């Protein structure tokens, strides 16, 4: 999500994400900045897309974090492999698909979208890594081609272990603040 420097005004909009590490994140951040130079977003897979909390307060946010912390103990760390560059036709969002780990992410989303963080999302959950959004429709095809070319040049691993998630909050200025890192349950042998 977009990194905050702490001076922004927080709003009732929260999400749960898994930041990508190392060279993989560096490349995806570079590609995103090619399309949105002002963006402070960090490459991530969203587990719970942005949503308000019912009865928004600092206490509600703390309760939501605790609920997530407990529920995440049911999920061991797992590997996610990134696939191809694709485009959501309805929204024209350019993204990297999830090739491996898609079902695990769907199960996690379904299990966590309850209680304090329950929300009826406007689109069906589809795990991915966003590359570009809110482009002019006439620019989407060329932007997707450029992103595919950059992605094809990446020679490092496209797989990551998901072993912790970050609970984040948005601001009026549309910068995301990390509130808490939440670990998944007992590790499995890698």
Language model features with spans:
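Short, basic/glycine-rich phosphate-binding loops at helix/coil junctions
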Residues: 86-93
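Basic, often amphipathic N-terminal segments
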Residues: 1-79, 87, 101-156, 164, ...
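Short, exposed beta-strand-loop hairpins at the edges of beta-sheets
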Residues: 169-171
